[in-house]
UniProtKB/Swiss-Prot annotation:
Heme 1 (or BL or b562) is low-potential and absorbs at about 562 nm, and heme 2 (or BH or b566) is high-potential and absorbs at about 566 nm. A ubiquinone binds at residue 199. This is Cytochrome b. GO terms for cellular component: mitochondrial inner membrane.
Length: 214
């Protein structure tokens, strides 16, 4: 008689206990991997949502309702995409907090690429927030884009260019959808560079112990 359940249990213990990671790396180092999982979830669900979405001010909200009600498993995709965005930010802020606490900012290339990733992620989230074109979407698009007018000399020109006119309208929504679709690919590319730069020197050692003894 072979106890497969016990074998599986032993295999799982071996898998999680004998990972090639030093004892000087704590649970806080999991959040980088979790961010990659979030990125995969958001890209996948976002692609399927984009198939059914209509970037038109008269049809955008209706297309969201259509996804929720008529598209098979559309409600799961929409909710996963929305909740996944919140989870993304929880993970990234925890990831940053760990970096600040343990002094990861001393690795300048990795830190600067990570800072750039955060800025692009915030921009992507903002563009996505506007897409349903409800009251809050319109308010957010108006208020946030108006901040560009504070830029000396170029402010008004940049705002008009982003709006596609002298007020927020259909061209604005089309541009925001295009930007929301393309920026995740910039995030994927920069994430690859971020990981390559990290593996170039290795992660920091908060406990200062020699991991070779493990």
């Amino acid at each position: 008689y072979i106890n497969y359940k016990n074998m599986l249990h032993q295999h799982m213990l071996t898998l999680f206990n004998l990972l090639p990671v030093g004892s000087n790396i704590s649970t806080w180092w999991n959040f980088g991997s979790m961010l990659l999982i979030c990125l995969m979830i958001q890209t996948t669900t976002g692609f399927f949502l984009a198939i059914h979405y209509t970037a038109n001010i008269n049809l955008a909200f209706s297309s969201i309702m259509h996804i929720s009600r008529d598209v098979p498993y559309g409600w799961i995709m929409q909710n996963t995409h929305a909740i996944g965005a919140s989870l993304f930010f929880i993970c990234i802020y925890t990831h940053i907090a760990r970096g600040i606490y343990y002094g990861s900012y001393l690795n300048k290339e990795v830190w600067l690429s990570g800072t750039t990733l955060l800025i692009i992620l915030m921009a992507t989230a903002f563009f996505g927030y506007v897409l349903p074109w409800g009251q809050m979407s319109f308010w957010a698009a108006t208020v946030i884009t108006n901040l560009l007018t504070a830029i000396p000399y170029l402010g008004n020109t940049l705002t008009t260019w982003l709006w596609g006119g002298f007020a927020i309208n259909d061209p604005t929504l089309t541009r925001f959808f295009a930007l929301h679709f393309i920026l995740p690919f910039a995030i994927i590319s920069l994430s690859s560079i971020h990981i390559l730069l990290l593996h170039n020197e290795g992660s920091n050692n908060p406990l200062g112990t020699n991991s070779d003894i493990d």
